[in-house]
């Protein structure tokens, strides 16, 4: 696979290019100006206007945390915010960003960097599973949709929000994964023999590989990182709209996710619901991890962490 090199280190970007991104920041933040108290944990839950993300965000707020709500649907986000405000134990603020756009993903990170001085937990939960398994969709950046939304967006956020995670250390990153299929680095975007479910599982494997790859580097910064298969085919809109029959509850997935947020579970692990699980062999392959990190940097112009360091 030939990848166009588009590395632009954030410290060397032209002023005009950086200014263009900064000027878009205001479009991502909602109107609320709610700030966390010093006693509250600050937790970003991507994809938190529905499904697992929504249930997790509400549970965290009930525990007294300040939750950064992310999604695309403003109306659904306001409903989540309203529930949190009516409960009164936690607080929240909403940011809108479409992860099918690297510009919007980076704009979200820039907005959060501008509005917060710390981040205790980053939960990379947002995901997509297309109902049409034969229609290959490409983002505005030219990348296969599942790979960008499910994996690259979380990679970008993890890299760009490292200063806030370090400011809150010990802090945590949790990648919400699923079943896995090995990546084909010669056809990373599935241009040949496309299958939507295959694309979904490969993107989830990339999340787990990222978890293992970043573990050593992030540990030096007192940041833990773990991946989770929350539960199989939960009763979420994404699963139902993709045409699958739900086989488990979103509450089970929520509780499994909360375990990684709240409990001392270590770092660099893949959890199958509540227990440590076994990922596919490629996920533990150091050379494959390093290759994924190199490719991710090339595709996004963001360096998140050194693989295996």
PLM features per residue range, with description:
Residues 42-45, 122-123, 173:
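Conserved hydrophobic beta-strands of the Rossmann-like cofactor-binding core
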Residues 244-282, 286-290, 294, 298:
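C-terminal helical subdomain
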Residues 63-79:
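Conserved glycine-rich Rossmann-like NAD(P)H-binding loop of the short-chain dehydrogenase/reductase
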Residues 127-147, 166-221, 229-242:
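Catalytic loop of short-chain dehydrogenase/reductase
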Residues 87-103:
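Rossmann-fold cofactor-recognition segment
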């Amino acid at each position: 696979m030939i990848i166009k090199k588009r590395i632009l280190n954030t410290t060397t970007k032209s002023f005009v290019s950086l200014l263009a991104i900064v000027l878009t920041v205001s479009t991502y933040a909602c109107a609320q100006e709610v700030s966390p108290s010093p006693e509250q944990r600050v937790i970003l839950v991507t994809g938190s206007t529905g499904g697992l993300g929504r249930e997790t965000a509400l549970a965290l707020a009930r525990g007294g945390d300040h939750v950064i709500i992310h999604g695309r649907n403003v109306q659904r986000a306001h409903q989540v915010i309203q529930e949190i405000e009516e409960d009164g134990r936690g607080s929240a603020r909403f940011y809108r960003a479409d992860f099918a756009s690297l510009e919007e993903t980076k704009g979200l990170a820039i907005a959060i960097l501008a509005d917060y001085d710390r981040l205790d937990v980053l939960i990379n939960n947002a995901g997509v599973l297309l109902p049409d398994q034969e229609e290959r969709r490409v983002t505005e950046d030219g990348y296969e949709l599942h790979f960008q939304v499910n994996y690259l967006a979380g990679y970008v956020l993890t890299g760009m929000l490292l200063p806030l995670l370090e400011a809150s250390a010990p802090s945590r990153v949790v990648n919400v994964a699923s079943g896995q299929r090995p990546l084909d680095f010669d056809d990373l975007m599935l241009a040949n023999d496309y299958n939507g479910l295959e694309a979904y599982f490969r993107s989830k494997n990339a999340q787990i590989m990222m978890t293992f790859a970043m573990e050593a580097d992030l540990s030096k910064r007192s940041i833990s990182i773990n991946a989770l298969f929350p539960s199989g085919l939960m009763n979420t809109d994404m699963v139902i709209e993709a045409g699958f029959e739900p086989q488990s509850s979103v509450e089970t997935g929520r509780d499994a996710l909360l375990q990684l947020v709240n409990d001392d579970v270590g770092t660099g692990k893949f959890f199958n619901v509540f227990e440590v699980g076994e990922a596919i062999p490629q996920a533990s392959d150091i050379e494959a991890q390093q290759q994924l990190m190199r490719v991710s940097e090339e595709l996004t112009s963001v360096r998140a962490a050194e693989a295996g360091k």
